[in-house]
Each structure stands twice: as structure tokens, then as C-alpha cells.
Amino acid sequence: MSASFEFVAPDHFTAGAVGPPGQRIFYLQSREKGTLVTLKSEKEQVRALAQYLSGLLEKLPAVGERMPRDLSLIEPVNEAWIVASIAVGYDEARDRILVVANELLEEEEGGGDPASARVLITRAQAAAFVKQAEALMKAGREICPWCSQPKDPGGHTCPRSNGHVHH
């Protein structure tokens, strides 16, 4: 069974990707008091988390504090485990957003409980995460205007053109 983590005042919370477009591996990363945790995630999990946080921030008071600037992944990028699901909540008393990531268990791992990572972030950290995630999504593969599928670096055989147009 993998380790669980709880960060109540992280100084770093971000998403990042390693590898060329089309082959990138996505990560969520948090650090508190020298403890760095990196979790492997899916691109769509990062996108969904950013969209949800963006919507949540619209319902909360404006971010008054300074947003973190450097949201790069911190080396070494060693994944603790793979994310299966992400949940988000708001702790009104502490004015913190709770992000909970749950571990994906492999079938052969048996009946143990999945690990979790609980991270309490500020509204400024959430706003910075949203901007970082948006930049990550834009840095991916170009989208075909006809079929809305990502284009590979070597070109794209568009199904809407019945495979006849390679662009």
C-alpha cells in the first residue's frame, strides 16, 4: 500500500507535464516543509480540476493575496502513485480549498485501501493553478479544425476528409 499525504499549508501546488506533445505525462505536485509529493495524473484530470477550481473561485471573494509565480515542477519528478479520482471542497472557516486525490489501485494489489493526498490551498494558489493548467493545455498538440482531434507532430489524416487530406 502506498503512503497517504496531508498538507495543511503547502508552499507549492502545481500541475506539470514531462515529454513532447502527444506523449506528455501529467503530474500534480505539492510541497510543504521540505516534503515534496508528485502524483501521476491524466491530462483530463488536470483540465477538470482547473475548470472546477475556476468555477469555485468565481463564487468566492476575489483573490487579494499575491499569486505564486513559479509553478514549474520541482525536480526530481518521482511519482508516489497514480491518481484515480480527485475531489474538491471549501473550508469556509479556514478560507482554504481542499483538494483530495485518491490512488488508483492495480488489481493485483489486492484489498488494501487506496492512499490519498489531502491538500489545503489558498484561493491565490488555486487561481495560479488554473492559469498553469490552462498554459499546459495550450502547450499540447494542435487541434484539427475539421474533426477536433489532436494532430500528431508528423501530420494528421483527418477522418472528416475520409483519410484523403493529410495536413
Where are the regions that the model predicts?
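Surface-exposed, interaction-prone regions used to assemble/regulate multi-protein complexes
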Residues: 11, 20-27, 37-38, 58, ...
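N-terminal interaction modules that seed assembly of large macromolecular complexes
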Residues: 19-52
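Short, surface-exposed beta-strand-loop junctions and turns on beta-sheet-rich folds
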Residues: 33-35, 44-46, 55-56, 104-107, ...
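Intrinsic, low-complexity N-terminal interaction/targeting segments
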Residues: 1-20, 26, 64-120
